[in-house]
């Protein structure tokens, strides 16, 4: 009987702990969203007179990032590393492998597009001094922007679903990945890419696939290093190497693509990039077996 009471007590304590953590995570989502929605437009008004479209486009994410800092300090009472991974340290080698695999794949596709249709890839005209200034801004701001999006639209909601650890069973992991796919697709409904796309359905599928597959890999690895790396690699490649006409994040890249948006080629590139990431990071997926659903 004593053992049964002890077991029941531990289960009850675990349930209360999960409820408290879920509540703090949910409140953090609300707080970060409030900073983004309420203070984002204020940041845009303050930064717009500078005359740099890239800074103006990223202004709302500065507000979002501030909300995350406040949330970590006062609601979650934990470090960013503790939020981002179940491991004792942030796994920079894993982050680096995922980043390079995705970035390298994007570079190969750019080379393919240039060789198969040279007229679709133009050198972006801009003075060298402006490009160097843009380089400094992008290297600092873009990782902040992508990390902020990851926290709000992937890390916090997935943590709510999985509980204390990311090592959950298959059904739990499937639900968390589907939830992430939905959350990644919805905020992009207002993007220019959707209105200018040859097929808006393909663009939405692109965002959803990005949300689902990257979350699935993150859960299997026991941390969000892969998600943070892939998102940063994607946006840094767009901002620095090859952007496209009508981009939601205007920059001064080396090249500009005039290819149509929302084509099956876009999905093929995303799939190839994520397959490359999986191959580069597969050693991280051999984590201890999660409890069965």
Regions found by a protein language model. Give the residues of each.
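Hydrophobic alpha-helical transmembrane segments of multi-pass integral membrane proteins
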Residues: 63-71, 99-110, 178-182
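Hydrophobic/aromatic residues in alpha-helical transmembrane segments
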Residues: 39, 43, 67, 108, ...
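Transmembrane helix-loop-helix hairpins at the membrane interface
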Residues: 135-293
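Residue-level signature of transmembrane alpha-helical entry/exit and packing/kink sites
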Residues: 21-29, 53-57, 61, 94-98, ...
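Cytoplasmic juxtamembrane interface segments
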Residues: 8-20, 69-75, 81, 194-221
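Juxtamembrane helix-loop-helix connectors linking adjacent transmembrane helices
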Residues: 47, 56, 80-148, 158-166
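N-terminal, membrane-interfacial amphipathic/helix-forming hydrophobic leader that caps
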Residues: 1-79, 252-293
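Membrane-helix interfacial "entry" motifs
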Residues: 13, 17-21, 25, 49-57, ...
């Amino acid at each position: 009987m004593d053992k049964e009471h002890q077991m029941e007590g531990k289960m009850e304590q675990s349930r209360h702990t999960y409820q408290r953590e879920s509540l703090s995570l949910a409140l953090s989502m609300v707080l970060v969203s409030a900073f983004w929605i309420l203070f984002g437009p204020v940041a845009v008004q303050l930064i717009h007179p500078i005359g740099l479209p890239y800074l103006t486009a990223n202004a709302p994410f500065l507000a979002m990032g501030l909300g995350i800092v406040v949330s970590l300090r006062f609601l979650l009472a934990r470090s960013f590393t503790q939020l981002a991974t179940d491991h004792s340290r942030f796994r920079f080698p894993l982050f680096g492998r995922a980043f390079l695999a995705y970035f390298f794949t994007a570079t190969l596709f750019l080379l393919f597009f240039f060789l198969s249709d040279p007229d679709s890839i133009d050198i972006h005209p801009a003075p060298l001094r402006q490009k160097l200034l843009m380089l400094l801004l992008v290297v600092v701001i873009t990782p902040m922007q992508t990390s902020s999006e990851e926290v709000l639209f992937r890390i916090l909601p997935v943590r709510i679903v999985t509980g204390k650890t990311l090592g959950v069973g298959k059904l739990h992991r499937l639900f968390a990945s589907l939830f992430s796919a939905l959350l990644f697709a919805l905020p992009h409904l207002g993007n220019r890419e959707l209105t200018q796309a040859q097929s808006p359905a393909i663009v939405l599928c692109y965002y959803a696939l990005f949300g689902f597959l990257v979350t699935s890999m993150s859960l299997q690895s026991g941390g969000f290093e892969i998600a943070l790396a892939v998102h940063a690699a994607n946006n840094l490649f767009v901002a620095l190497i090859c952007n496209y006409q009508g981009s939601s994040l205007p920059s001064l890249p080396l090249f500009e693509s005039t290819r149509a948006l929302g084509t099956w080629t876009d999905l093929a590139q995303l799939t190839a990039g994520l397959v490359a990431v999986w191959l580069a990071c597969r050693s991280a997926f051999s984590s201890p077996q999660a409890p069965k659903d």
